[in-house]
Amino acid sequence: VAKSSVGLEVGSSTVRLATVSRSRSGSVIEHLNSIGLNPGVVVDGEVVDAEALSGAIRHLVKVGKPGGKDVRLGVASQRMVARQVDLPWVPPKEFKQALPLLAADMLPMPVQDCVLDFLSYEDLVDDDGAHVIRGLLVAANEQSVLDTVDAVESAGLRVVSVTLTPLSTLGALADPLSPNPEALLDIGHTMTSISIHEGGQPRFVRILSRGGQDITAKLAEHLSIDEEDAERWKLSLPVTWPTMNAADQSATETAMRTALADLVSDIRTSIDFYATSEGRRPGRAYVVGGAGATLGLLPILASVLRIPVAVGTPHVTRHGKSMSADELAMAGSPASASAVGLALGAA
């Protein structure tokens, strides 16, 4: 009998809901839906208007037909950090209790205000001969997480787990057999996360305060139009591009390169930092997120990063028979990866 799980991604402009069923024959995406949020409901990953968010989620549940009330929640904000650290070895039974003390000096915020997790992937002996555990330390502001959980549960759902969204997405897309590190670029409305894994293990996560909204603002400035018109123009490009003459295409390329320059530069800086500190570069990158389909983004990233860059799609490739045309279209877009990854519980 197939078992289903539900992933819920709360972004700054959109909430996405995915139901994935699993059986011996594999995983199947059964339903995939989203709803837009009004500006100011969620700002940079922080819930500002809990009532409006709950209302949007209730409406999404009505149309999204999730496979149950239990959801795996994905969150990301500027008040969350994830970094590779070496911690002193502690017996496994004592580790959870000891983690706040071990991590206190490694965080940019008070440890007592945080929810902590540690993804260990290597036991080793350091240069001083001490036994240490290497892994990814994840910290999130506790009140920020609770605000999101409360809004979700006020909509009639039960949150069974909370995951830093980039980690669940990475788990759904990463190739554990890749001989080289891989980068996942999740480009949202106001934030972009950069995650790098090696052999399926997350080694690096950085959250940037730039996203699709910044691309639109740069376009508006370059084209001397307001941001609403710039957003409409940006979204129409996949349709209008093939009909443009050579001069218009050249002007469009210039506009997009200008609009993408700051975001692409920040992404390159983050990947260069990883390459310098670890002594190896990612062999390829995948792009997901609501702004991941921006025209020109992939070739510009590939040129600047000097590695292959492709749209990221979850390992689940089978779609349920009851999926609508809109759901199938969403399943093929880079925006779907996070919600599906959460439903898979891959983090």
Task: Label the model's feature ranges.
Residues 1-102, 146, 156-158, 180:
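Non-catalytic, solvent-exposed interaction/assembly segments
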Residues 70, 74-176, 284, 314-321, ...:
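Active-site neighborhood for divalent-cation/phosphate handling
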